Amino acid sequence: MAQFSESVDVPDMGRRQFMNLLTFGTVTGVALGALYPVVNYFIPPAAGGAGGGTTAKDELGNDVSVSKFLESHNVGDRTLVQGLKGDPTYIVVESKEAITDYGINAVCTHLGCVVPWNAAENKFKCPCHGSQYDATGKVVRGPAPKSLALSHAKTENDKIVLTSWTETDFRTGEEPWWS
């Protein structure tokens, strides 16, 4: 029978082993930090609330306050916000007290360029290939084959909430192509 002493000496960690562990920890931390945004890219965003809507965001990513929005915009103004699926969406000021009940998706139906509002000509004009849309987003001149997509815009707790438009397109009388 072998006798074991109670005080078993554990050898100290050598300098080389310590440096290896330190290097491994550093490389692992940097690699995980670099992989985090890549992994997040492939994870879909969380679903909207019970209403399925998306709160409109300004250019800084803050929720758009309806009262402040109406104070700083004139009747008839069309202003870009971040809307459904992160798409740029125009909010239209209907009166000093209200916005229209719809938002206009600013992505051109031809090749996907963002279509700016031209207030002087009272229409949207695509800078890529010249497509033109009227004040409601209905296509009036190609090469764009379809009108700009719509979304419902409503006010909840002083915020603009955008929801999917699934009803008949009031501009064309047809079923919406985007739903």
Curated annotation (Swiss-Prot):
GO terms for cellular component: plasma membrane-derived thylakoid membrane. This is Cytochrome b6-f complex iron-sulfur subunit 1. Gene3D superfamilies: Rieske [2Fe-2S] iron-sulphur domain, Single helix bin. Residues 61-162 form the Rieske domain. Component of the cytochrome b6-f complex, which mediates electron transfer between photosystem II (PSII) and photosystem I (PSI), cyclic electron flow around PSI, and state transitions. SUPFAM superfamilies: ISP domain. Its main location: membrane. It catalyses: 2 oxidized [plastocyanin] + a plastoquinol + 2 H(+)(in) = 2 reduced [plastocyanin] + a plastoquinone + 4 H(+)(out). It is an enzyme of class 7 (translocase). Its EC number is 7.1.1.6. CDD domains: Rieske_cytochrome_b6f. [2Fe-2S] cluster binds at residues 108, 110, 126, 129. Belongs to the Rieske iron-sulfur protein family. The chain crosses the membrane at residues 21-43. Keywords: 2Fe-2S, Disulfide bond, Electron transport, Iron, Iron-sulfur, Membrane, Metal-binding, Thylakoid, Translocase, Transmembrane, Transmembrane helix, Transport. Disulfide bonds join 113-128. Binds 1 [2Fe-2S] cluster per subunit. It holds the Pfam family Rieske. It comes from Nostoc sp. (strain PCC 7120 / SAG 25.82 / UTEX 2576). The Rieske iron-sulfur protein is a high potential 2Fe-2S protein. GO terms for biological process: photosynthesis. HAMAP family: Cytb6_f_Rieske. It is found in: Cellular thylakoid membrane. GO terms for molecular function: 2 iron, 2 sulfur cluster binding; electron transporter, transferring electrons within cytochrome b6/f complex of photosystem II activity; metal ion binding; monooxygenase activity; oxidoreductase activity, acting on paired donors, with incorporation or reduction of molecular oxygen; plastoquinol--plastocyanin reductase activity. It is a single-pass membrane protein. Its cofactor is [2Fe-2S] cluster. The 4 large subunits of the cytochrome b6-f complex are cytochrome b6, subunit IV (17 kDa polypeptide, PetD), cytochrome f and the Rieske protein, while the 4 small subunits are PetG, PetL, PetM and PetN. The complex functions as a dimer.
